[in-house]
Amino acid sequence: MKKLLTFFILLITATVSAQDISRTQLLKDLEILSSDVYEGRKTGTPENRMAANYITGRFKDIGLSYYQDSFKHPFAFKSRNGENIQGTNLIGYIEGKSNRVIVISAHYDHVGITKSLIYNGADDNASGVAGLLALATYYKNHKPNNTLLFVAFDGEEMGLQGAYSFLRNPVLDGSRIELMVNLDMISHNDKKELYAVGSFKNPIIKKILKNADEKSGINILFGHDDPKLGRDDWTMQSDQGPFAQNNIPFVYFGVEDHRDYHKPTDEYQNINKDFFYGAATAILNSLNKLDNQLKKISRNTNPAFQRTLKEKMIMN
């Protein structure tokens, strides 16, 4: 009888685990956000604002809380050619058991239309936003140890503008932010490889994420964060960059560039659906580990990295 009871407990546990992320909803969010309706989600366009409305609608459905009476936090900046552009960051949160904060982010903008061709950005970065929504859904039903701030950044493709604006105009005390987890391009890889970038700066992250890819069907690799790598150092290549400049530890999940990167062929039908679901599962496993062991992660990052980062900031 005890063995039978144990079997049923394990069966129930396995079933719940399998339902942590809804594959159907994950793919639905990606497919919708990368459809022609949003015309590539370029910052400052009506279609970008339509995408923002979809995402904040999902925030509301999930039950996220918001700051300053809205999920939407507008900001203004000048483009590289001097044009005044309005962007909007989308921010919701789930209160944790502690005062510490983990920022979980994904940029929702892409590059729009060029020569009548729509660049829908399925992998870059409708996939990250869909993953963010899946994580928010999970943690709404599983209270985290730390407060989780879910941020869909705008203006990433125009120079990480949303991330810089967020740090200049924080919705909460910035000293509470102890970790940033960024999702950018997580649905397209033929080798079943997902990179977790950030352990060069904080080696403890690699230890915390050990075996986070178990039963996900994909492999988490570490790298692309050594300053000696030049362009292959991804630290400043997505929204984690401004956080790194502010000495905030980060983990950036993403894949290496692929044949459809920044091309009109970055479409829903060209992503790897099994890989995407596995990546989302592995990221959830990773975030659970990070949430449970956040106290181990310190802002005292690798001194060599900090020196190189300051040099890059001066050069820029």
Task: Tell where the protein language model's regions lie, with residue ranges.
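Alpha-helical metal-binding/catalytic segments enriched in His/Glu/Asp
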Residues: 92, 104-105, 109-110, 114-159, ...
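Bacterial Sec-dependent N-terminal signal peptides
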Residues: 1-21
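Metal-dependent peptidase/peptidase-like ectodomains
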Residues: 99, 153-252
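A non-catalytic alpha/beta surface segment that caps or lines the substrate-entry region
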Residues: 41-94
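N-terminal capping segment at the start of a domain
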Residues: 21-50, 62, 259-266
